[in-house]
Design a protein with these regions (language model features):
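Conserved class I S-adenosyl-L-methionine
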Residues: 2-51
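Conserved Class I S-adenosyl-L-methionine
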Residues: 3, 190-286
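Class I SAM-dependent methyltransferase SAM/SAH-binding core
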Residues: 55-59, 63-112
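Helix-to-beta-strand junctions that scaffold the AdoMet/dcAdoMet cofactor pocket
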Residues: 75, 132-133, 145-146
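A short acidic, Gly/Pro-enriched loop at the edge of an enzyme's catalytic core
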Residues: 111-122
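Short catalytic micro-motifs in class I SAM-dependent methyltransferases
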Residues: 127
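A short, conserved alpha-helix within the catalytic core of class I
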Residues: 132-140
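Conserved catalytic/acceptor-binding region of the Class I
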Residues: 142, 146-219
């Protein structure tokens, strides 16, 4: 059984709200979230081609959706340390990860990684980096990655280009949250903003070879999957708090009914974006 290590790198007992508090009680809904396209983890496997094994650090692992995808692609020669500060998420991750996968789930945060210096070939975060203090996270990435090691950040979002259903779904959120606009992300301190991960990494002297890729995944889903998947998004939870839960739920039911086919399925497209960079080998540059 995958291990869950509760060793804390932050004060969980603090009463000050933390960005990960938003995920309390949402672990159950994550089983309805879409899988990450296998091509994303496969890209990382190819990029790690110079090594035959090693250590992967994942930050903000949630319920382990991306963790398991990476573990499957890389195989047993890579040990994955999956850090997740929300206890409910860690519990679901450990329970859903097959026995024998070389994964350890631990309490930990992006800004203070409980990882030895220069110990990892890959540091990754999936659907989480927008909640980090990224300047501190990038400093930690430089510290924990070996020379030539890979920093990879993945974002997964509804793809509204050419999809009336995805457009209507995002419009429900925009109508409930005046400061939210599609393609914006939650900020750690609250509110929403657009982020440019590629641009941020290109501005750092400690990383080079910044690349961006995108994979669009289309999926036919039924009403139950759609509703539970919607409830797994903190942005939907905030929309229900800002307006009225029953009103938001009624809107979601309505757009599903409007777009469902004869089999009571809707096409929900998602885009997975991956941005990668390599830690500079200063010895080679000098």
């Amino acid at each position: 059984m995958p291990r869950e290590n509760a060793t804390a790198s932050h004060a969980e007992s603090s009463q000050v709200p933390k960005p990960w508090d938003d995920f309390d009680g949402l672990g159950h809904y994550y089983q309805y979230r879409p899988e990450y396209p296998s091509a994303v983890a496969e890209q990382l496997r190819v990029m790690l081609g110079n090594w035959t094994g090693g250590t992967v650090i994942e930050v903000g692992a949630g319920t382990g959706l991306f963790t398991r995808s990476v573990a499957t692609a890389l195989g047993p020669t890579y040990r994955i340390v999956a850090l997740e500060p929300n206890k409910d998420m860690r519990r679901h991750a450990a329970s859903q990860t097959p026995a024998g996968m070389p994964v350890t789930y631990m309490d930990g945060i992006a800004e203070n990684l409980a990882v030895a210096d220069h110990s990892a070939q890959l540091l990754t975060a999936a659907s989480a980096v927008h909640r980090f203090n990224r300047s501190q996270f990038y400093q930690e990435a430089e510290r924990v990655l070996i020379a030539g090691g890979i920093l990879a950040m993945v974002q997964y979002k509804p793809f509204d280009r050419g999809s009336a259903f995805a457009d209507d779904f995002l419009s429900v959120i925009e109508g409930a949250l005046p400061t939210y606009r599609r393609h914006r992300h939650s900020k750690p301190e609250g509110g929403y903003s657009e982020i440019d991960i590629s641009g941020e990494l290109k501005g750092l002297s400690t990383f080079q070879g910044v690349q961006r890729g995108a994979f669009v995944h289309h999926e036919q889903i039924d009403l139950e999957t759609f509703m539970y998947r919607a409830l797994s998004f903190t942005i939907i939870q905030k929309a229900m708090i800002a307006t009225d839960r029953s009103h938001v739920m009624a809107q979601l039911f309505e757009i599903f009914d409007r777009h469902a086919d004869q089999k009571r399925l809707v096409a929900m497209p998602y885009e997975a974006e991956i941005v990668t960079a390599r830690r500079v080998d200063h010895a080679l540059k000098s």
